[in-house]
Curated annotation (Swiss-Prot):
InterPro entries in UniProt: Bact_Sensor_His_Kinase (IPR050398), HATPase_C_sf (IPR036890), His_kinase_dom (IPR005467), HisK_dim/P_dom (IPR003661), HisK_dim/P_sf (IPR036097), Sig_transdc_His_kin/Pase_MprB (IPR008358), SpaK_NisK-like_HATPase (IPR044082)
Topological domains, Cytoplasmic: 1-18, 177-459
GN (gene name): spaK
Organism: Bacillus subtilis
Membrane topology: Multi-pass membrane protein
Any one Gene Ontology cellular component term annotated for this protein: plasma membrane
Domain Histidine kinase: 244-458
Entry protein name: Sensor histidine kinase SpaK
Superkingdom per UniProt: Bacteria
Pfam families according to UniProt: HATPase_c, HisKA
Amino acid sequence: MGIGFKGRKTLLRELVKYMVTLCISLVVLALLYIFINTIAMNTGFSHPANYNEREAEKLAPKLETIDKVTADMIPDTMSYAILNKETKQKTAGTIKEKDLQLVKKKIEKKPYVNYKQKGYLVIERNNEYCVLQYSLRADFSSPLLRKYLPNYELTSICILIILLIIVISIITTYFANRLRKHFETLNVITRYIKEQNLQFTPEFTHIKEFDDVIDSLIEMRDALQSSLEALWRLEKNKKEQIGALAHEIKIPITIIKGNAELLSLSMQNEEQAEYTKYILGAGNQIEQYIYQLIHLSKTEDALTIHLEKASVDELTETLVKDISAYKGNKNINISFKKENLMKEAKIDWQLLHRALLNILTNAVDYTPEGGTVSVHAECDSEIFYFFVKDTGNGFSEMGLKKATELFYMDDKSRHSKGHYGMGLTFAKNAVNLHNGELTLGNTIAGGAEVRVKIPLRNE
C-alpha cells in the first residue's frame, strides 16, 4: 500500500539527527563554559590557578627580612609554618603536620609527590624557614564564596556536569517522545485490529521503517476483514438453513404427534399404549429441540430486545418458583439468596427470564441426587449479579472455552439426557443483548459456576 511520496525519513537519519543535535549542543555548552570562565577571570570574580603562587612570590621578600613572621601577615588564601633550621620542627603556623612532610623533603631536595595540587614556597631566614602553602586551583575572589563553596574550579566543573546532564536529558527526551509517538501510532492500529474495529483510517509517521510496519498491519487488517466477512456470511447462511430446516421439520413432527395422540385415544393393549407413549415423548423432545433451534437462529439477526421497566425482585421470585417446579421430586437442595434487589429497572423481562432459567435448569439437570444448587442474586447501583453454583462434575477445560457455543455438549464431564448444547448459547446471546457478561468457571469443590452481570438502566 505505502504512503506514496518521496523523502521519507529513516530511523538512521533520525539517529544521525539526534547525534548531531547532541554534539552541537555539547559544543555550544563547552564554548559557553569557556566564555563564562573568561568573563569571571577578567572581571575579578575568580582568580586563576597561579594567582596564589604569584601573591606568595610577592610576599616572599618582606617575610625574608622581617624580624618575626606572624599570622596576620599571611593572606587568608594561604597557610604558613615556621620551621627550626636545624631540627626542621614546626615552631608556629597553620600548615598541618602531614603536609609538612612534603615541605621537609623539598627543603632536603628529596623527591616527593604532591597529590593535592598545593604549592609550597620555602623562604629561608636567619635561623628558620618560613613556608607558605597555597592552592594551585582557580578560586573565588570573594571570601564569603570561598567560605561556603568549594574552590571555583571544582564548583564550575560541577555546574558544567549538571548542565551536561540537563542538556543530554532534554535532547534525549525530545527525540524519545517523537519515537514514542510513532510507537503509539502502531499500538493504536494493533489495538483496533485486536478489538476487530477494522473501519479506521491509519495515520502514517513519515518514517520509512514505521510506515512499512503500518503497511503490513493494513494488509493484515484487510485480510482479516475479508475473512471475518466471509465467516459472517457463512454463519448467517448456516443459521438461515437451520431455521428453515427447523420449520420444515415442524410439519411432519406435528403430524406424528397428532396421529400418536389419536392412537392414544383408541383401544390399545398395554404394550401398544407404552409404544404410543414413547412416540409422544420423543415427539415432544424433538418439538422442544426445534423450538430452541428456531429461536437460536433468530437470536442475533431477527431477535430484538424490548426494554421495559420491570421488577428485578419479581423476576427473581418467578425464577425461584419456576426452578422449584422444574426440580419436581428430584432429591436436590436449591439455596436461593437475594440481596438489595431493585424494584424496577429497564430490562427485557421475557428474554432475561428465559436466559436465567436455562442456566438454572442446566444446574438442576447436572446436579446429582443429594446435591445442592446455590443461587445468589444481588443488585448494586448499576449491576444485577446472578451467580449459580452446582455440585455436579463441573466443566472440563474445553467446556470452559466452548460451553456457550451452539450444539457444544461437554460429554466427558457434564453429560445429561435431553441437552442439545443450546441452553447456554441462548443465555449468552440474551445477556449480550443486555450489554451484560456471562462467564463460566468451576468451584473449589469441583462443581460448575455460571456468573452473569447485567448493567441496569432506570431510564
